Amino acid sequence: MKVREITEELEYKLLSPYAAKSRESRGRAREEEKCDIRTDFQRDRDRIIHSKAFRRLSHKTQVFISPEGDHYRTRLTHTLEVAQIARTIARALRLNEDLTEAIALGHDLGHTPFGHSGEEVLNKLLKGGFRHSEQSIRVVEVLENDGKGLNLTWEVKDGILNHSTGGKPSTLEGQVVQISDKIAYINHDIDDAIRGRVLKPEDLPKDLIAILGDKHGKRIDTMVRDVIYNSMGKPEVSMSKEIYEATYQLRAFLFEKVYIGSKAKRDEEKAKRVVEQLFYYFYDNVDKMPKEFVRLAEIYGRERAVADYIAGMTDKYALLKYKEIFLPSPWFEQNIFDL
């Protein structure tokens, strides 16, 4: 018996009846020969980790644009925190950890530079709108691997597509990632806001802190434990009413004090202008994009290809392209022998 087959048999023996089983996957868009060692969900996880889009997450904004300091979250550290929380919950509920981890690692692959600021601009400019969850699917189906995509399983793509608020993942593993995403960003955005002096610990609503905890780690522990004990033996993943209400009131507090009305957002309009002007420039000058995006423009149209190009940019690369295109180069940077 192959190692993969042993692992698949163990899933039936050890996992919850509500867990997704590798052998029962709805499969891939293109059939592939099975791996002797890894299950299909394990292969998906590995493909995501080795993708270029995953590596670029390290230079994409989470909340704070161009923060001064080495300890602020990026889109990559957020992704890793989501994966850690999700695996803890999945293991406790005896769900499929490999599927959970693959969804968690891939859930933000389509995020724009400058966080949700970049997403707002592309959503305004594209006729059909722009959502990072849908772009994440486009990354794994079309943009990665020289246009062939990663050919992920249906279950992983379903979890990625439906991870945002309002989505309805078809697997419990997808539900775990959806709730873990909220737990991660609510807590680490508070941590970053305090580090950036946007908030002080005493600013946090006392009634909510009394329920959830007065420290970063304590709040995460409270939420994770609540999800686990409230979901055991059930065909859905959720928080208890008390913790859910406290968590979402804390989220509303963040929207008011950090995401919308704080000095942390002072550069947001500048970032939006960068994305907008890059979009218009490349829309009018398709030939200035890398050749793979010129090819995409021929297949999917200019608007879609330009959005694909810009959405894949890191903050640093977007600013570099903006500087190259729109800002004059000082003459003293030139070699005098070129004059």
UniProtKB/Swiss-Prot annotation:
Q: Does the keyword Transit peptide apply?
A: no
Top-rank taxon = Bacteria
| S-S bonds | none
Annotated PROSITE patterns? HD
Q: Where is the HD domain?
A: 75-186
Any one Gene Ontology MF annotation carried by this entry is: triphosphoric monoester hydrolase activity
State the UniProt keywords alphabetically: Hydrolase
Gene3D superfamilies on file:
Hypothetical protein af1432
| Residues forming coiled coils | none
Task: Kindly indicate whether the keyword Protease belongs to this entry.
Answer: no
What the entry lists under PANTHER family is as follows:
BIS(5'-NUCLEOSYL)-TETRAPHOSPHATASE, SYMMETRICAL (PTHR35795:SF1), SLR1885 PROTEIN (PTHR35795)
UniProt lists the family membership as follows: Belongs to the dGTPase family. Type 2 subfamily.
Protein's UniProt name: Deoxyguanosinetriphosphate triphosphohydrolase-like protein
Q: Which organism is it from?
A: Caldanaerobacter subterraneus subsp. tengcongensis (strain DSM 15242 / JCM 11007 / NBRC 100824 / MB4) (Thermoanaerobacter tengcongensis)
